[in-house]
A protein has these predicted regions:
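Extended, amphipathic, non-transmembrane alpha-helical segments
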Residues: 108-114
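Secondary-structure edge/capping motif, primarily at the C-terminal ends of alpha-helices
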Residues: 85-88, 121
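Short linear capping/connector segments at secondary-structure termini
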Residues: 117-124, 155-157
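Terminal low-complexity tails and localization/encapsulation signals of metabolic enzymes
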Residues: 1-72, 76, 83, 90, ...
Length: 157
């Protein structure tokens, strides 16, 4: 049996300091509303004329615009992902662990703004949004633990 895994703990929004942090995050998100988000194909930003509006289901506010890709751009992105996978498949366990831990650290560092955007874009409440972020952290941390154990020849269960 594997030991050492602990689930991420959800933010307690009854604490005043956390309420202030999420309220500041909402201010930041509203200030960023209306931004255009480009495609990223092979690491390069690509803006397109056609955009898809992200609209809050609760307020109907336009939160931003995602660039819409053509079939050719989708094909190009798929090709780029295959190339990235080839490189990633040669990446050492240590480097994969480093990358995943960095991802988890970035999620924690940006937790409140991530929660605020999730609330605005999905209509979820604060706790549900943070619960989803915790689930992301749990998956990442679980993957890290499992790849390290596989590298040591341990079984997953």
């Amino acid at each position: 049996m594997l030991t050492g895994f602990k689930n991420a703990v959800e933010v307690d929004f009854t604490l005043e300091e956390n309420k202030k942090k999420i309220e500041e995050a909402f201010k930041q998100a509203h200030a960023e509303a209306g931004a255009v988000y480009p495609l990223i194909i092979g690491g390069k930003k690509v803006e397109t004329e056609k955009k898809i509006a992200s609209v809050s289901p609760a307020t109907k506010e336009v939160l931003g615009y995602a660039c819409s890709c053509s079939k050719e751009q989708a094909d190009e992105a798929i090709k780029a992902s295959y190339e990235a996978f080839k490189k990633w498949s040669l990446t050492s366990v240590e480097e994969r662990v480093r990358v995943l831990r960095r991802l988890a650290a970035l999620l924690i560092e940006n937790r409140f703004i991530m929660d605020a955007w999730n609330v605005l874009e999905s209509g979820k409440n604060w706790g549900e949004a943070d619960g989803e972020l915790c689930e992301q952290l749990d998956f990442i941390n679980s993957y890290v633990m499992h790849i390290q154990n596989l590298e040591k020849g341990k079984e997953l269960v």
